[in-house]
């Protein structure tokens, strides 16, 4: 059974967001994610991860991300990019990871085919790719970046730092604590968990759910 906001079991553990909240309730102080950054191991507990994912999901909701939307995620294997996948799932959205070394023109097809409105990217390199093809992707409205280095002089209104989105989400979650719980409760086992696009070596890439 999944844990409710108060930590009590309330629903089956049949979706990733419910599993995350359950882990935060029953083993909140245990390590959930570790990453070596600049030679030093960084550790996040289950409670910390759940808090970050909730805040990210609420921030996305504030920007208009909703059930059925696809979320492009582009970058190296970093904790926040994995958390973004679960944040999309909390809202009933579908994460669409893209290969970070793909050139911009290859990404354009996926963004258009997947009708992507939101993209969470790692850094300036990926932002530049998104801006290069934005005119080819009419649905793309929000480009959210994790690493702010090099972004100071970018003025495009479609850009926003992920830190800002998470901060906005924390306020949203504090003011409306039942919102994300309700969204998670809407999740079903038959919901699409992730969409992966094929390489396209024998034709156009295809989204596989």
Can you describe what each PLM-predicted range is?
Residues 45, 66, 94, 204-205:
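Short coil/turn motifs that cap or connect alpha-helices
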């Amino acid at each position: 059974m999944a844990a409710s906001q108060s930590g009590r079991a309330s629903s089956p553990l049949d979706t990733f967001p419910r599993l995350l909240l359950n882990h935060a309730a029953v083993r909140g102080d245990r390590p959930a994610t570790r990453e070596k950054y600049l030679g030093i191991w960084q550790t996040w507990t289950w409670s910390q991860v759940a808090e970050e994912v909730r805040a990210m999901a609420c921030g996305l909701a504030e920007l208009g991300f909703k059930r059925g939307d696809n979320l492009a995620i582009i970058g190296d294997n970093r904790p926040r990019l994995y958390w973004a996948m679960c944040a999309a799932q909390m809202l009933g959205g579908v994460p669409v990871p893209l290969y970070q070394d793909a050139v911009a023109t290859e990404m354009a097809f996926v963004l258009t085919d997947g009708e992507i409105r939101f993209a969470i990217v790692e850094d300036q390199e990926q932002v530049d790719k998104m801006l290069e093809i934005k005119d080819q992707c009419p649905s793309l409205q929000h480009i959210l970046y994790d690493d702010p280095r090099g972004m100071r002089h970018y003025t495009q209104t479609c850009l926003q730092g992920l830190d800002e989105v998470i901060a906005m989400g924390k306020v949203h979650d504090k003011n409306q604590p039942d919102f994300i719980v309700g969204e998670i409760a809407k999740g079903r086992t038959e919901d699409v968990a992730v969409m992966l696009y094929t390489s396209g070596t024998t034709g156009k890439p295809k989204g596989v759910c």
